[in-house]
Amino acid sequence: MIDLKIETAENILKYSYVLLENEFKNIQIGNDLIPLVNNSPLKKEKAERPEMNHFLLTKYNAVEENILYSSKILYELLEKEKHIDQLFLDYAKSQGIIINLNIERILYLSLTFLYSLGKVSFNQNMISRTES
């Protein structure tokens, strides 16, 4: 008796006598029918990657998801010391958007960026511009 292992596409082709091709161009393995079309997992085609535009500052479509842009707006809104929640609400009002989890994450990253440049300082939950 022949030891039959069907694990990979190579083994399927090797033991092709197990496979039956019916009139509808399908391969039958037991009760499973696998269609022989271009999108079949047996026929892998090399997909071309789209070219990347390296001159964009961000890979996102929404300008609010750009950390540099958001940092600039947050810095302009910090005329005086503000609570972090009030700063985020002012940002949403000035941009005409609703804050969601992704926007809030971008705003925290923007504040971290400004802090790393030494442009803002934190005192508990209060944020202010630094005099430089």
From Swiss-Prot:
<protein>
    <recommendedName>
        <fullName>Uncharacterized protein YydC</fullName>
    </recommendedName>
</protein>
<dbReference type="Pfam" id="PF20293">
    <property type="entry name" value="MC6"/>
</dbReference>
<dbReference type="InterPro" id="IPR046897">
    <property type="entry name" value="ABC-3C_MC6"/>
</dbReference>
